Amino acid sequence: MTLQVCKDDPWLKPFEEELLRRQALVGQWKDHFAKEGGLAEFAASYKRYGLHVNKDNSVTYREWAPGASEAVLTGDFNGWDRQQYHMTRDEYGLWSVTVPPTSDGQVAIPHNSKVKLALKTSNGQWVDRLPAWSTYVVQDLSKSPIYEAVFWNPPESEKYQWKNKSPPTPANAQIYEAHVGISSSEPRVGTYKEFTKNILPRIHKLGYNVIQLMAIMEHAYYASFGYQVTSFYAISSRYGTPEDLKELIDTAHGMGITVLLDVVHSHACKNVDDGLNNFDGTDHQYFHGGAKGDHPQWDSKLFDYGKYEVLRFLLSNLRFYIEEYHFDGFRFDGVTSMLYKHHGLGTGFSGGYHEYFGDEHVDQQAVVYLMLAHELMRELQPLLRPGEDAGNFLSIAEDVSGMPALCRPVSEGGVGFDYRLAMAIPDMWIKLVKETRDEDWDMGNIVFTLTNRRHREKTIAYAESHDQALVGDKTLAFWLMDKEMYTSMSVLSDPNPIIDRGIALHKMIRLITHSLGGEGYLNFEGNEFGHPEWLDFPREGNGSSFHYCRRQWPVVDDKLLRYQHLNEFDAAMQHRGDHYGWLSADQAYVSLKNEDDKVVVYERAGLVFVFNFHPNKSFTDYRIGVDQPGTYTLVLDSDSPEFGGFGRIDHEKTRCHTEPLEWNGRANCMHIYIPSRVALVFAREDDPRRK
């Protein structure tokens, strides 16, 4: 039997045996999990591992630590007595102990009290560890930078009560990438509650239907942007409590917004005292032993995805966030590093299929883990979210390699992701604005980069994400306008050609990326209004300053500043995109890429998109080809005054009638006026979606 992916892409046929072998490995793991009730039940291990209250109010603690010779649970609850609760070990290295209730039948370990695991390693040394399955850990910098585990077991009256169902899966994924900690305009760490109150309404008003939350999994080093995870089951306590995060997600759901977790399963922080590294005294418990377990660039540890208990830990982690916090899916970080033994370092991908296959290049165990993760989400769908209107669990891969079939179902021979990030697109835009004169922009290369994606594999397009905002780089707006943003963004200022150019190109770049670059779109928090400068977390090198570690919301709220115009355009783009459904439509038909005129024309979702990137030439009676005959009028004009434009087009008088003359490969044509540095979107007057 030929796999569906090989039918769709004949270039995969020589590698079908390897694709089938991956499927067989997934099947073998499922057979192993069957003895624990199957994949979904295996991934419910978070309900058994860690600390859990039993019906009789006793507390049972389980921890896998095969390299330890003794284990003791201790904490505030017993005065840190290291003799009272010695744990027993089974043949697989699973330690357990039960703490009986108090004499009056209450839970002996108080809510929000601190606990520790003391382990005796094989060399006879006693070490303290945070339980690996801790759901809340805290830091008291007045005492130590090392995190401490907390037993989170609030009384029923303090537990968050869910009010809203998860929304249906959006057909047009418009993603707002956000970081709770930087969401305050003040120079400090923001909170879950502040995000719920102040930021969610902004996101909803803009028209985004998905939020991708970064830096939620606990990380000891704030400046790691959340990518050096220390406690995988603990949500970051910097921003508040588990109940606060639940309120945030529930409120978003009430607004019809899907919420994704930026999950980091590609590596782990190398911290020992408050991480997983050397947890049981060995370097090979959760990770590969020796140099194989070290990421040469990230200075972090690499999971051994071929181990039964590692799969338990990671697969359960996914179900935990879905079931406990009602996350609607995941953006998997660092997928390229997982897929390949070389981690994508020092390797350029030419597109040759041999680069994506073979045990020499590919970490098959990691690929199989990702396939199992998607099989888990598929199994959990009817179990946790029954009903036709229930949203599906979404997944996005951060992969720069372009591995074929990454975003195809496991049953068809793929890895299972719904989307991949179009990581070449932001690189193209930054390179253009940094290195190339406007008059030398290559329309053909822009279009090629935006449309270069695999057949039947969906892509999330973006002009910039958090990666481009970090210190050492700058936001797109700052590359375009730089220091002029400090002095010339007032609506009362004299006209400034640098600002005018920057605002015009910022809108054009985002619209062409949104409408041509993929089947979904992503924006990083604040960039919708052209956030100035860069992002720099407090660290030793900047005097622990929060000055660049915040979002400057006052500039977009100030009606005397031009940031409002970029914000209004972004909102119009999101609302038009969702209304007309161009992201879920077939890929665009590009009818014109004129290098001399710097004009690009394409059609998608029954709309006609026209871009004039020329720095100073406007065109009257410019003939363009269109597929459908009729009368066309504007539904979006980047030059409109409310978007900071010059209002060079009279919308009331702009009615473009087609002629039955073939032009640029289209059956009809029409004549339009295209001012310089303007993007226009036309729809037929009789389009029922205009009603």
Swiss-Prot record:
Its EC number is 2.4.1.18. The record marks 467 as: Transition state stabilizer. Keywords: Cytoplasm, Glycogen biosynthesis, Glycosyltransferase, Transferase. GO terms for molecular function: 1,4-alpha-glucan branching enzyme activity; cation binding; hydrolase activity, hydrolyzing O-glycosyl compounds. InterPro entries: A-amylase/branching_C, Branching_enzy, Glyco_hydro_13_cat_dom, Glyco_hydro_13_N, Glyco_hydro_b, Glycoside_hydrolase_SF, Ig-like_fold, Ig_E-set. One of its GO terms (cellular component) is cytoplasm. GO terms for biological process: glycogen biosynthetic process. The active site is at 333 (nucleophile), 398 (proton donor). Pathway: Glycan biosynthesis; glycogen biosynthesis. SMART domains: Aamy (SM00642). It catalyses: Transfers a segment of a (1->4)-alpha-D-glucan chain to a primary hydroxy group in a similar glucan chain. (1,4-alpha-D-glucosyl)n binds at residues 80, 116. The keyword Glycosyltransferase applies. It is found in: Cytoplasm. Belongs to the glycosyl hydrolase 13 family. GlgB subfamily. Glycogen-branching enzyme participates in the glycogen biosynthetic process along with glycogenin and glycogen synthase. Generates alpha-1,6-glucosidic branches from alpha-1,4-linked glucose chains, to increase solubility of the glycogen polymer. This is 1,4-alpha-glucan-branching enzyme. It comes from Yarrowia lipolytica (strain CLIB 122 / E 150) (Yeast).
